[in-house]
């Protein structure tokens, strides 16, 4: 009986998914025929962008520095704060329960907001400029790194930690000496990955006055100077390439155990490895201190106690009429539109990313082909999601369909990278054995590779869906549907009651997605 029931669970799940996908696509007005009929607009735009104005190159180096400065300072500061407070969120470490609940509530609230919304809020506190952007990146990094770190701590071997506690050691020093060495490689790897993400986020914070290259990028797109837009995107692509290959090197160093042994003071570490590890740490410290010293100070000239009081009063007293409204401009409809945009965009991106991942690794294709597709994926990832929105809106017009196209392309870049990492980590033995038996590569992949990577693929898709929910919430800024436009308009008009209702809706939405993801 149980076997018969289990046999129907998978087909039923796929049918349910297809029904949800169709309903979400219909709700967002997806029209492939419209996109195909107007694809010439996209090709003309792409042709202009792919002929960059190289004479404009020197003028964007300083804004790019500010973008990198915000990314470095925010990532390092947020990660350091996360490392300090994350043990309080781990259930297995038995810190005070009130501290764990308070920390998890704070992280849940902060994770609900994309970096762009945090940056806009920061401009009301610290004025325009890179300090507001750095503060937003710090909060964004702190929220994500804290969650990842206390989850890693919960899965770590806590026997050494418990032994130190039983010997009278305090909990935090016990965490430093017993748990941190085990989770440090994952912590550093997550920080490197988040740094790359933060570079893309920092490149659009100028849209809300938080400094960086985003203000110039928006200006050139608005003026239709697409040759200069191509120059900016080319520079961002080169930056992402440098970060990508640097991350690969540092990840290899981390996984080799050099950094962990250096922190633990292991005498087994060779002199050459010790010097190399110290040089890497010294380089990171120097870069961080330089970026911190070059940070522009906050501008409190437009910040007053009365303004902060009005902001706090409005955010804590949401507009309940708007919150419960079922009209097309009400919160419920806008949140539903945001969910549908994320569902369709993530699904399309995942469907296209799976075959691209196989073409992106040398395990399944020749090295030159893998290198070519790797460059394409990095180019896709180097463009901020709002830029895709501004490009697609000239093809499909304003509306939710533009948001779907934007998130689909963004999902391709990130999911292909995640899927490729999964493929490179599998055991190739079964696949090679089937090939040696004369089996065609396609069925060999289906029977030997897909069973190994299916859980990791599903986790990556769910993670990307969680990210897309937040990114879809700001796509309205460029007319791509969702809750973003009403939220940003409410904040710019100091309508804090309405902004409070929208922010509360976002918190509940992300919280609900987290609950569903945890039960996968």
What do these predicted ranges mean?
Residues 23-33, 119-126, 196, 290-299, ...:
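A structural signal for multi-pass alpha-helical bundles of membrane permease subunits
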Residues 1-72, 76, 243-347, 359, ...:
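N-terminal, non-cleaved signal-anchor transmembrane helix
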Residues 213-250, 483-519:
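Hydrophobic alpha-helical transmembrane segments of polytopic membrane proteins
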Residues 61-69, 103-110, 196, 332-340, ...:
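Alpha-helical membrane-interface segments at transmembrane helix boundaries
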Residues 107-141, 377-408:
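Generic hydrophobic transmembrane alpha-helix motif, especially the helices
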Residues 73-107, 344-377:
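Transmembrane-helix boundary motif in ABC transporter permease subunits
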Residues 128-194, 201, 245, 398-449, ...:
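Membrane-cytosol interface at the C-terminal ends of specific transmembrane alpha-helices
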Residues 35, 47, 92, 96, ...:
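Transmembrane alpha-helices and adjacent helix-loop boundaries
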């Amino acid at each position: 009986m149980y076997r018969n029931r289990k046999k129907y669970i998978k087909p039923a799940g796929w049918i349910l998914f297809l029904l949800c996908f169709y309903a979400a696509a219909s709700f967002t007005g997806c029209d492939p025929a419209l996109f195909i009929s107007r694809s010439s607009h996209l090709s003309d735009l792409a042709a202009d962008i792919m002929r960059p104005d190289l004479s404009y190159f020197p003028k964007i180096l300083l804004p790019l520095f500010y973008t990198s400065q915000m990314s470095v300072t925010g990532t390092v500061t947020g990660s350091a704060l996360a490392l300090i407070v994350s043990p309080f969120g781990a259930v297995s470490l038995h810190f005070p329960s009130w501290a764990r609940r308070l920390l998890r509530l704070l992280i849940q609230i902060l994770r609900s907001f994309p970096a762009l919304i945090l940056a806009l809020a920061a401009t009301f506190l610290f004025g325009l400029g890179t300090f507001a952007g750095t503060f937003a990146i710090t909060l964004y990094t702190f929220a994500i790194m804290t969650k990842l770190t206390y989850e890693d701590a919960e899965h770590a071997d806590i026997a050494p930690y418990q032994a130190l506690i039983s010997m009278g050691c305090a909990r935090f020093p016990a965490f430093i000496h017993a748990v941190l060495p085990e989770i440090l490689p994952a912590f550093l790897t997550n920080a490197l990955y988040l740094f790359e993400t933060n570079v893309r986020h920092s490149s659009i914070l100028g849209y809300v006055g938080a400094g960086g290259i985003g203000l110039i990028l928006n200006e050139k797109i608005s003026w239709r100077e697409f040759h200069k837009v191509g120059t900016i995107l080319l520079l961002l692509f080169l930056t992402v390439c440098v970060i990508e290959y640097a991350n690969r090197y540092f990840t290899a160093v981390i996984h080799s155990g050099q950094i962990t042994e250096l922190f633990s003071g292991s005498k087994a570490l060779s002199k050459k490895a010790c010097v190399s590890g110290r040089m890497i740490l010294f380089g990171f410290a120097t870069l961080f201190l330089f970026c911190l010293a070059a940070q522009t100070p906050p501008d409190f000239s437009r910040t007053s106690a009365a303004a902060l009081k009005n902001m706090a009063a409005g955010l804590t007293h949401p507009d309940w009429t708007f919150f419960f409204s079922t009209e097309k401009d009400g919160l419920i409809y806008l949140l539903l539109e945001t969910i549908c945009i994320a569902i369709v965009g993530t699904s399309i991106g995942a469907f296209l990313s799976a075959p691209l991942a196989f073409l992106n690794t040398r395990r399944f294709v020749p090295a030159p082909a893998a290198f070519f597709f790797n460059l394409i994926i990095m180019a896709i990832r180097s463009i901020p999601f709002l830029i895709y929105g501004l490009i697609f809106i000239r093809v499909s017009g304003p509306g939710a369909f533009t948001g779907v196209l934007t998130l689909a392309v963004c999902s391709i870049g990130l999911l292909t990278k995640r899927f490729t990492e999964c493929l490179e980590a599998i055991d190739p033995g079964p696949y090679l054995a089937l090939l040696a038996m004369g089996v065609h590569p396609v069925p060999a992949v289906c029977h030997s590779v897909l069973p190994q990577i299916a859980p990791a693929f599903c986790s990556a898709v769910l993670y990307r869906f969680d990210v897309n929910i937040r990114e879809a919430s700001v796509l309205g800024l460029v007319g791509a549907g969702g809750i973003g436009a009403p939220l940003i308009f409410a904040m710019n008009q100091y309508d804090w009651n309405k902004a409070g209702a929208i922010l509360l809706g976002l918190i509940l939405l992300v919280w609900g997605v987290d609950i569903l993801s945890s039960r996968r």
